[in-house]
Amino acid sequence: MAHQAHAYHMVDPSPWPLTGAVAALLLTSGLAMWFHFGSMILLTLGLITMVLTMIQWWRDVIREGTFQGHHTPPVQKGLRYGMILFITSEVFFFIGFFWAFYNSSLAPTYELGECWPPTGITPLNPFEVPLLNTAVLLASGVTVTWAHHSIMHGDRKEAIQSLTLTILLGLYFTALQAMEYYEAPFTIADGVYGSTFFVATGFHGLHVIIGSLFLSVCLLRQIQYHFTSKHHFGFEAAWYWHFVDVVWLFLYVSIYWWGS
């Protein structure tokens, strides 16, 4: 291999973006097939493809960044910019849902009874499960910051403990949200209230699941001594977790508290 006289990472050709795209197509098509025809074949195939893609893509990135040293300071700087742009795109993604909610709730039409929540909808009590969920997510924000500071100070044991606690809080939040959905007195088919509620909180819940998965990989890497006090970009991408926290606060204030 020729000597590389610059600090930038020339990425090798990779099949994982393509297999990831195929998995995404299978998942979305599979969901439609499952909803309308009760068949889970495509959905299962999509899930298997997605899991295999994620495992092998993570393996490649860990090898390049940790063992081959390709993630030099300029490369890490580029990755940070990429993460900031990704989170910015996610902000606009959620702005769309808030826009739909406020557009419907600030000027409810006569079909909704000219009131909000619409006639016939019994909203959830914001001071029960939603308030507990808020406390759980805020606590997870504290523990993930604790984990970050532990890694920066080289305190391996505390980093593992706090990261484990963060993941458990994320899973607890997901379980509470699933229970809330199961017991909700309205469904996604109940007009604009049901659709905006379930789409906004559902996509947020999906982000919590993805974040928990990424933090689990960070935990495994921390256990295997991959992170140092100076080189731990994989964990710094936990900015995503703080973003999920902030989105939930807006959801809680807008949809659960004000919207009820």
From Swiss-Prot:
SUPFAM superfamilies membership: Cytochrome c oxidase subunit III-like
Source organism (scientific name): Xenopus laevis (African clawed frog)
GO MF annotations in UniProt: cytochrome-c oxidase activity
Subcellular location: Mitochondrion inner membrane
Main location: mitochondrion
Top EC group: translocase
Topological domain spans for side Mitochondrial matrix: 1-15, 67-72, 153-155, 224-232
Keywords on record: Membrane, Mitochondrion, Mitochondrion inner membrane, Translocase, Transmembrane, Transmembrane helix
Mitochondrial intermembrane membrane side: 35-40, 106-128, 184-190, 256-260
Entry's EC annotation: 7.1.1.9
Role: Component of the cytochrome c oxidase, the last enzyme in the mitochondrial electron transport chain which drives oxidative phosphorylation. The respiratory chain contains 3 multisubunit complexes succinate dehydrogenase (complex II, CII), ubiquinol-cytochrome c oxidoreductase (cytochrome b-c1 complex, complex III, CIII) and cytochrome c oxidase (complex IV, CIV), that cooperate to transfer electrons derived from NADH and succinate to molecular oxygen, creating an electrochemical gradient over the inner membrane that drives transmembrane transport and the ATP synthase.
A single BP term in Gene Ontology: mitochondrial electron transport, cytochrome c to oxygen
Membrane topology: Multi-pass membrane protein
Subunit structure, interactors included: Component of the cytochrome c oxidase (complex IV, CIV), a multisubunit enzyme composed of 14 subunits. The complex is composed of a catalytic core of 3 subunits MT-CO1, MT-CO2 and MT-CO3, encoded in the mitochondrial DNA, and 11 supernumerary subunits COX4I, COX5A, COX5B, COX6A, COX6B, COX6C, COX7A, COX7B, COX7C, COX8 and NDUFA4, which are encoded in the nuclear genome.
Protein family (similarity comment): Belongs to the cytochrome c oxidase subunit 3 family.
Organism classification: Eukaryota, Metazoa, Chordata, Craniata, Vertebrata
Bilayer-spanning residue ranges: 16-34, 41-66, 73-105, 129-152, 156-183, 191-223, 233-255
GO cellular component, one term: mitochondrion
Catalytic activities: 4 Fe(II)-[cytochrome c] + O2 + 8 H(+)(in) = 4 Fe(III)-[cytochrome c] + 2 H2O + 4 H(+)(out)
Name the UniProt record assigns to this protein: Cytochrome c oxidase subunit 3
